[in-house]
Amino acid sequence: MAANAFVRARIDEDLKNQAADVLAGMGLTISDLVRITLTKVAREKALPFDLREPNQLTIQSIKNSEAGIDVHKAKDADDLFDKLGI
């Protein structure tokens, strides 16, 4: 597929430079990233990344789970259903 269209965007120069440095470390340019991202959007009909950020409760729950705090275990499905009361 021939690359014959241009995409322009106004962004903060410092942000652009930071991103370019990170991408250069990966062997990519900003143009490479835009091309890869747009290709995935066109193919998958969705963003190739999640824009949602976890709220404080979710963040704390993840930390607790990773630390083994307030983690509930079940021996099998029947035990789980009993603990859930179903």
Curated annotation (Swiss-Prot):
Record keywords: DNA-binding, Repressor, Toxin-antitoxin system, Transcription, Transcription regulation
Signal peptide: none
GO MF annotations, alphabetized: cis-regulatory region sequence-specific DNA binding; DNA binding; protein homodimerization activity; toxic substance binding
Effect of disrupting the coding gene: Cells missing dinJ-yafQ have reduced biofilm formation.
GO cellular component annotations of the record: toxin-antitoxin complex
Cited InterPro entries: Arc_rbn_hlx_hlx, DinJ, RelB/DinJ
Post-translational modification summary for this protein: Probably degraded by the Lon and ClpPX proteases in vivo.
GO biological process: DNA-templated transcription; negative regulation of DNA-templated transcription; negative regulation of DNA-templated transcription initiation; regulation of growth; single-species biofilm formation
UniProt cross-references to Pfam families, sorted A to Z: RelB
Similarity field: Belongs to the RelB/DinJ antitoxin family.
Subunit comment: Forms a heterotetramer with antitoxin DinJ, with 2 YafQ-DinJ dimers associated via the N-terminus of the DinJ antitoxins (YafQ-(DinJ)2-YafQ). In this complex the toxin activity is inhibited.
Cited function: Antitoxin component of a type II toxin-antitoxin (TA) system. A labile antitoxin that counteracts the effect of cognate toxin YafQ. YafQ and DinJ together bind their own promoter, and repress its expression. There are 2 operators with imperfect inverted repeats (IR) in the dinJ promoter, YafQ-(DinJ)2-YafQ only binds to the first (most upstream) of them to repress transcription; binding to a single IR is sufficient for activity in vivo and in vitro. DinJ alone is as potent a transcriptional repressor as the heterotetramer and also only needs to bind 1 IR to act. Cell death governed by the MazE-MazF and DinJ-YafQ TA systems seems to play a role in biofilm formation.
Name this polypeptide is given: Antitoxin DinJ
